[in-house]
């Protein structure tokens, strides 16, 4: 978590004028996950093996033609790395563009009617540092008639406030009369470990794209609110 000194933050529902900002923040966070995926794929053993073979092939070819110095080898390594990262960025962007499109459908978690079920966290009364959605059980995108957390996003510098947002969502779920709350995430989501720290456990772990070979998964996590201190059933 960040070492930034804690300040007072304001967590509230968005106004009508702020609803478009919710969607924009969520989309930007998904774009960030595409970068996480491209880096994850680059370091996958299979991808590294292909990279190594290509690099050695080019290295030997240039050595035969002109000879290689340490500087030339270093520059060659950088260039080949950049090409391999660029090649994998395109399919990663495409898969998250597809996710964004699905989320913005009338039955998706960012459907127009769902934006009012988000919370925004502001610091110094103006700067938005994070959002979290807590969809009612009957809302589009909710998982099997349970209140469902979606698009929990916090600026990395302000991660120390992340659990304030999550607690707001959990309280909302409890006020809905729920004993179980779900969360929809992807394996590239930087907040996944934070969910695990709060005792969310996976109930769905599925491959949904050919990039799942490299570890991309669609997850649904759940948490029993009756076992959460401070969230006893108040029905």
Swiss-Prot record:
Note the InterPro entries from the entry.
Answer: Acyl_CoA_acyltransferase (IPR016181), Pho86 (IPR024297)
Protein name as annotated:
Uncharacterized protein C12B10.02c
GO cellular component, as recorded: endoplasmic reticulum; endoplasmic reticulum membrane
In which compartments does the protein localize?
Answer: Membrane
Q: What top-level branch of life does the organism fall under?
A: Eukaryota
Regarding the membrane, this protein is recorded as: Multi-pass membrane protein
In terms of SUPFAM superfamilies, this protein maps to: Acyl-CoA N-acyltransferases (Nat)
A GO molecular function for this record? Answer: L-cysteine-S-conjugate N-acetyltransferase activity
A single Gene Ontology biological process assigned to it is: endoplasmic reticulum to Golgi vesicle-mediated transport
**Positions of transmembrane segments:** 41-61, 71-91, 129-149
Q: What is its main location?
A: membrane
- Record's keyword terms, sorted: Membrane, Transmembrane, Transmembrane helix
């Amino acid at each position: 978590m960040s070492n930034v000194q804690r300040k007072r933050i304001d967590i509230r529902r968005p106004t009508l004028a702020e609803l478009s900002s919710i969607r924009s923040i969520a989309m930007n966070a998904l774009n960030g996950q595409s970068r996480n995926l491209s880096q994850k794929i680059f370091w996958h053993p299979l991808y590294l093996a292909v990279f190594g073979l290509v690099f050695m092939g080019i290295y030997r070819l240039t050595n035969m033609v002109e000879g290689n110095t340490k500087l030339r080898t270093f520059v060659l390594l950088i260039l080949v790395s950049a090409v391999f990262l660029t090649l994998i960025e395109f399919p990663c962007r495409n898969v998250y563009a597809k996710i964004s499109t699905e989320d913005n459908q009338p039955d998706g978690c960012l459907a127009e009617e769902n934006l009012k079920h988000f919370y925004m966290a502001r610091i110094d009364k103006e700067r938005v540092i994070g959002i979290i959605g807590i969809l009612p059980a009957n809302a589009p995108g909710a998982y099997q008639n349970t209140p469902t957390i979606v698009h929990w996003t916090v600026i990395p510098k302000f991660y120390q406030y992340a659990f304030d947002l999550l607690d707001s969502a959990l309280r909302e779920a409890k006020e809905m009369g729920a004993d179980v709350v779900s969360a929809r995430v992807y394996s590239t989501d930087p907040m996944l470990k934070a969910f695990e720290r709060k005792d969310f456990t996976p109930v769905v772990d599925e491959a949904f794209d050919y990039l799942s070979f490299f570890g991309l998964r669609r997850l649904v996590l759940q948490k029993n609110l009756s076992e959460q201190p401070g969230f006893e059933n108040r029905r």
